[in-house]
Amino acid sequence: MRAKNTEKIVPNYEELSLDTLLFKFNFVSLQSKFMRSVKIKEVIDALEKFAPLPLQESYDNAGLQVGLTGAEVSGALLCLDVTENVLNEAIKLGCNLIVAHHPLIFNKLSQISDKDYIQRIVIKAIKNDIVIVAMHTNIDAAAGGVNFKIAEKIDLQNVRFLGKTQSVQTKNGEVIGGLGVIGELTKPLAADDFVLLLKQTFNVECVQANQLLRRPIKQVALCGGAGAFLLKTAINEGADAFITGEMHYHDFFGYEQQIQICSIGHYQSEQFTTEVFKSIIENQCKGVVCHITKINTNPIIYI
């Protein structure tokens, strides 16, 4: 059998004709032409298609916060909160779009000055042509949104909405949203093992909890952020445990051996929201480079 010649053949471009070289150049140019640029508005449209603004709570201010959306996206920085450090990070990375979970502008602004960090961010974002958009309670309520991501992290099965659902009509058709989710663990856990699972999954040193449940935990309800309003619904739906980000002192009273309450921290409960943003943008807006912020914006420290 004749041995194969494995020597790498290097083309001699000096021997290529001018027509061949021009063809190669035009082919590359044609490829670049069809790699369509994406406008900021298209990214926002993709996010709002997934989580329409009508799903947000009446008190909320989700949606566009700052800027003009007609420019091409140079990069998207994804975060929970927009702080001055996050804005500086976007500038350093060359991102002209910041997608945040919590709205920068929540209350009415009566002036734009350097009085506080919100106003300073607005001014600096405009100066640097950076658009800021927030996806808040609309993506909390969306199917596949924040609460579904939390459920995924602790491997809940048969996940469905916990509280009331609503249907909104959009140009893309009907979208269903709801409050919180409920699902089942793959196997029952003792209460102390369940708390350990939360500590490991959400990288928290402590969990605020009521008296540990003496029966196994199988069915789990949850709501990211401040979800105490869904506690009684969780009990009515037969949940063994309820996870949320924060609760008031008096919310813990009266449920001993009825349900395991676990408050893991507002920031900690919503920390994976940026993964939801990234998935939407990369699937719907091909070519847009997404960066998840490296800045921990949690204003609460544990000493």
PLM features per residue range, with description:
Residues 4-12:
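Polybasic, lysine-rich low-complexity intrinsically disordered segments
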Residues 11, 20, 24-31:
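Short, positively charged and aromatic/hydrophobic N-terminal segments
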